[in-house]
Amino acid sequence: MDKVLNREESMELMDLLGLERAAWGNLPLMRKAYLRKCKEFHPDKGGDEDKMKRMNTLYKKMEQDVKVAHQPDFGAWHSSEVPTYGTEEWEAWWSSFNEKWDEDLFCHEDMFQSDEEGTADSQHSTPPKKKRKVEDPKDFPPDLHAFLSQAVFSNRTLACFAVYTTKEKGQILYKKLMEKYSVTFISRHSSHGHNILFFLTPHRHRVSAINNFCQKLCTFSFLICKGVNKEYLLYSTLSRDPYSIVEESIQGGLKEHDFNPEEPEETKQVSWKLITEYALETKCEDVFLLLGMYLEFQHNPEECRKCQKKEQPYHFKFHEKHFANATIFADSKNQKSICQQAVDTVLAKKRVDTLHMTREEMLTERFNHILDKMDIMFGATGSAVLEHYMAGVAWLHCLLPKMDTLIYDFLNCIVFNIPKRRYWLFKGPIDSGKTTLAAGLLDLCGGKALNVNLPMERLTFELGVAIDQFMVVFEDVKGSGAESKDLPSGHGINNLDSLRDYLDGSVKVNLEKKHLNKRTQIFPPGLVTMNEYPLPKTLQARFVKQIDFKPKIYLRKALNNSEFLLEKRILQSGMTLLLLLIWFRPVADFASDIQHRIVQWKERLDSEISMYTFSRMKYNICMGKCILDWAREEESETEDSGHGSSTESQSQCFSQASDTSGSADAPASQTPDPYDHDNPYHICKGFVCFKRPKTPPPK
């Protein structure tokens, strides 16, 4: 061990290892200390880089010299092997014994000449320069960078690659790559004394896979592998100066048309914008409803029955425009995502309108929407009967006195939205018409119905439904302490009493939905319906007006005899209330933007529904009859009295002349059908027949 390092180096190494100098030669202990100090001195661990380098140098030198010292022939000899002193054999043995010491003991005895002693030639001559080693290139030539992929860490797969290596390795890799990847084409090019391999593979590979394969064959030679973005441009550049083609797998090489196949048909993509526009025009906020309606557009509009009937305006008005896009949409894999984005756009548009539009403008827009719907339903292609809806107007007008004024005042309350004067209360027993009128007002203004009879912990998300709504209805609120034992108790009134900030509208409240952030806004105004439950004074003060409903037997009988009002939900429709306002209110009460449309509808109602007809409807309601029995009664009364007009007399004479019996009193089985178009006093469904009966003179 004393011959491994000199004294100064051994002492320095032991100090660096942190061991006592007496431990010199204990190789296992020194090895453990070396590994421990490597972690301590390593620069990445915050150690001293200089100490690390010095310790590595001394330790490696010590290890190398220890290996030489432990060789079998190092200083090993036996007494029997020593020849006789003075012989030639002994001289040879002594020379071999001292061979390993000659290097350490050798010194130059010749003195170097000083500058003064040097000759003139030695002072002015330049020593021969050593031949510098040519450095390996670090990248492809700069003029090729535009055609190569510069991605270093990428999982992208390609089918064209370029390899830059030495001339000797280029010859080997040319054959190895051809065998390994069954290349479609490969060529070898010379470049500044090196080789560039350009090749195409039948399958796509990562650049790292090609590089790893080539690195196995290039242990010492440099290797650069990259993917090719512009195949033909790179190949054509490598075929011209300063490059040249050495060999290639296809005679004549590649041509430009080899990289320009026939252009396939462009894959048509679904237009998300068209679907969003459709959702905005129809104001659809339901993802699955939008998905179902748009899938119906994939059928040919010329063969579509819905388009031929023209009953659904949201279908026949948009079918032809969206047919081509719906055909592509039917094959899409992300239909729900597209519809979800369209619905989100509708909600975003609604939020913007809530922020920037006045409540009067929002109500006017709602009225325009209902008027558009009325134009289609009562138009030439519509299936709705105007008399049915006017019968609903007559029924609602009999529900409460001055119904038109009541609705007008409610709309003013909703539009102005004054704090602590924003809510109405509809109170009354069962089947008194509270919910019917509340549902009609909700459909007229637009909004949501909420259930506050839930437990308080579930009420948070129920209130979140009111986000960005124009109005709300707290429907059928339950309480406790009612006089009637038939009324069940509930948490509704207590919950409403806990929502005073919501009802007042003075401060903004936090509303939240599942999977959405909280929305801070003024809670929308509205009304509350309930049975005869007692109210605390704190809650009673939140209602600006209370309307007490009472059941009316004649209204119930008329409703039971007029089933079309229930089947078509005419009484709960906002169109019925709008027709009521058009019939009773002056044009000046409406917004100026829609007054011209109100005038048109007033003229139409005057031409189709006379005051006498409307009076007969109200008379039948008061009598508990079918509301549309006025036509049948007029026919029978005209036959009995004989005071009909000339047209009526002619039709009566015509019917009598066609009667084979010739008697004046027709049997009950031959009573004219009020729905027969040949009867001048028929009830016309739609606009198939334009024969309108003349209004009989007042009796």
Curated annotation (Swiss-Prot):
Matches recorded under PROSITE patterns: DNAJ_2, SF3_HELICASE_1, T_AG_OBD, ZF_LTAG_D1
Cofactor note: DNA helicase activity requires Mg(2+).
Compartments reported by the entry: Host nucleus
Keywords, comma-separated and alphabetical: Acetylation, Activator, ATP-binding, DNA replication, DNA-binding, Early protein, G1/S host cell cycle checkpoint dysregulation by virus, Glycoprotein, Helicase, Host nucleus, Host-virus interaction, Hydrolase, Inhibition of host innate immune response by virus, Inhibition of host interferon signaling pathway by virus, Inhibition of host JAK1 by virus, Interferon antiviral system evasion, Isomerase, Magnesium, Metal-binding, Modulation of host cell cycle by virus, Nucleotide-binding, Oncogene, Phosphoprotein, Transcription, Transcription regulation, Viral immunoevasion, Zinc, Zinc-finger
Composition skew (Polar residues), residue ranges: 643-672
InterPro entries, A to Z: DnaJ_domain, Helicase_SF3_DNA-vir, J_dom_sf, Lg_T_Ag_polyomavir, Lg_T_Ag_Polyomavir_C, P-loop_NTPase, T_Ag_DNA-bd, Znf_lg_T-Ag_D1-typ
Residues carrying N6-acetyllysine: 691
Post-translational modification, as annotated: Phosphorylated on both serine and threonine residues. Small t antigen inhibits the dephosphorylation by the AC form of PP2A.
Transmembrane segments: none
Residue positions binding Zn(2+): 304, 307, 315, 319
GO biological process per UniProt: DNA replication; symbiont-mediated perturbation of host cell cycle G1/S transition checkpoint; symbiont-mediated suppression of host innate immune response; symbiont-mediated suppression of host JAK-STAT cascade via inhibition of JAK1 activity; symbiont-mediated suppression of host type I interferon-mediated signaling pathway
Location of the DNA-binding region in this protein: 141-256
Region entry Disordered, spans: 115-137, 637-678
Motif residue range(s): Nuclear localization signal: 127-134
Locus of motif LXCXE motif: 105-109
GO molecular function, one term: helicase activity
Role played: Isoform large T antigen is a key early protein essential for both driving viral replication and inducing cellular transformation. Plays a role in viral genome replication by driving entry of quiescent cells into the cell cycle and by autoregulating the synthesis of viral early mRNA. Displays highly oncogenic activities by corrupting the host cellular checkpoint mechanisms that guard cell division and the transcription, replication, and repair of DNA. Participates in the modulation of cellular gene expression preceeding viral DNA replication.
Quaternary assembly: Forms homohexamers in the presence of ATP. Interacts with host HDAC1. Interacts (via LXCXE domain) with host RB1; the interaction induces the aberrant dissociation of RB1-E2F1 complex thereby disrupting RB1's activity. Interacts (via LXCXE domain) with host pRB-related proteins RBL1 and RBL2. Interacts (via C-terminus) with host TOP1 and POLA1 allowing DNA replication. Interacts with host TP53, inhibiting TP53 binding to DNA. Interacts with host preinitiation complex components TBP, TFIIA and TFIID to regulate transcription initiation.
UniProt name for this protein: Large T antigen
